[in-house]
Every structure is written in structure tokens, then in C-alpha cells.
């Protein structure tokens, strides 16, 4: 009887080990929070360099997609350009500031300000991509895509932002989007 219990315990341990392995495979990659926190700190530094009173803004990472379609007879396809963005928002002034950057956060561009009182319209587009769309005027727009976390470090900033994204979405939908 004791021998049977020892074998059963060993079998249960092996089953748990195998199930743990499968659950990790199906769960997907785990977020490296140390790397994510370091990148969030770099985002803050770049944003504060670019934006006066940058500390007054909360931040998320976002990106834009520019898709160009081509048709060369039998060859059809598309080419997508990704633009990385540090997106800051201030609830009191109802302002969104977008600062272009690169995936490794080694540099930044100049900020663009979108004040609620000065834009033509803003809305959340659910299809074909989940994007926050802002039209500052009739001639142009920006579509900001944002997710909790994206794993491809060659294309996107590596940062986990579930809580921040929820706060930005709430601000955008309740205080910034036009009806």
C-alpha cells in the first residue's frame, strides 16, 4: 500500500509538471516586468524632455500604422509602416500629446498637441483595428492603436500597460471623444 502511494505521488508530480508546461505554452509568453518598468521610465524621461510640465500627463505607449497597397499585375500585397508613439493625456486640460519615438526608446520627435476644444472630432474605431482616432482638422487625422502589451520588440516598445490603457480608454471615451 505504501509503495502504491509513492508511485501515485510520483505520477501526480509528473502530471502536474506536464500540465504546468502545457499551461505555459497555451498562456503565451510572460511579461518581463523589469524590462517593462525600465522602458516605462525611459518613456517618461523622453516625454518630459519634449513636453513642458510633462509630469502633469499620464502615459501609454501607442503606435500608428500606415498601410500601402500595391498591385503589379500578378503580384498584389501591402506594405505596413509602424510609427511608435508616447501618448500623454491630461484630464484637467482635456489634452492629448503625442511624441514619436522608436522601439528601443533611443530618441524622440517633436510633440503634437490635441486639445479637446480645438479638434474637429475624435472617436474610437473598433473595426478593422481598435484605434483611437483624432481629426484635428478636415485635412488630416491620427489613429492611435494601443494594447496592454505587445511582444515584438523590433516593432514596438516593450511595456506592459493594462492599468494605464484602461485609464486612457476611460478618459478618451468619457471626456475627449466627440459625440
Task: Label each region the model flagged.
Residues 11, 46, 56, 60-62, ...:
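Intrinsically disordered, low-complexity N-terminal regions enriched in serine/proline/glycine
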Residues 21, 112-113, 117-179:
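Acidic, Ser/Thr- and proline-rich intrinsically disordered linker/docking segments
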Residues 20-89:
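Anionic N-terminal interaction surfaces
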Residues 1-18:
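Short, Lys/Arg-enriched N-terminal segments with co-localized hydrophobic residues
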Residues 2-4, 20, 84-86, 149, ...:
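Acidic/proline-rich low-complexity IDRs
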Residues 67-72, 95-98, 105-107, 139-151:
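Short, surface-exposed beta-strand/loop "edge" segments at domain boundaries and coil↔beta transitions
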Residues 78-84, 91-131:
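Phosphoinositide-binding peripheral membrane targeting modules
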Amino acid at each position: 500500500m505504501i509503495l502504491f502511494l509513492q508511485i501515485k505521488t510520483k505520477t501526480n508530480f509528473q502530471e502536474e509538471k506536464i500540465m504546468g508546461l502545457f499551461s505555459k505554452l497555451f498562456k503565451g509568453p510572460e511579461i518581463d516586468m523589469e524590462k517593462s518598468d525600465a522602458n516605462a521610465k525611459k518613456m517618461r524621461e523622453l516625454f518630459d524632455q519634449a513636453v513642458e510640465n510633462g509630469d502633469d500627463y499620464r502615459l501609454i505607449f501607442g503606435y500608428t500604422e500606415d498601410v500601402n497597397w500595391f498591385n503589379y499585375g500578378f503580384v498584389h500585397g501591402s506594405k505596413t509602416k509602424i510609427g511608435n508613439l508616447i501618448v500623454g493625456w491630461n484630464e484637467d486640460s482635456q489634452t492629448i500629446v503625442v511624441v514619436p519615438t522608436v522601439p528601443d526608446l533611443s530618441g524622440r520627435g517633436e510633440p503634437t498637441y490635441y486639445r479637446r476644444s480645438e479638434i474637429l472630432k475624435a472617436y474610437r474605431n473598433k473595426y478593422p483595428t481598435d484605434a483611437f482616432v483624432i481629426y484635428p482638422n478636415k485635412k488630416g487625422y491620427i489613429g492611435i492603436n494601443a494594447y496592454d502589451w505587445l511582444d515584438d520588440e523590433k516593432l514596438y516598445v516593450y511595456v506592459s500597460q493594462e492599468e494605464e490603457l484602461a485609464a486612457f480608454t476611460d478618459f478618451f471615451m468619457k471626456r475627449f471623444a466627440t459625440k
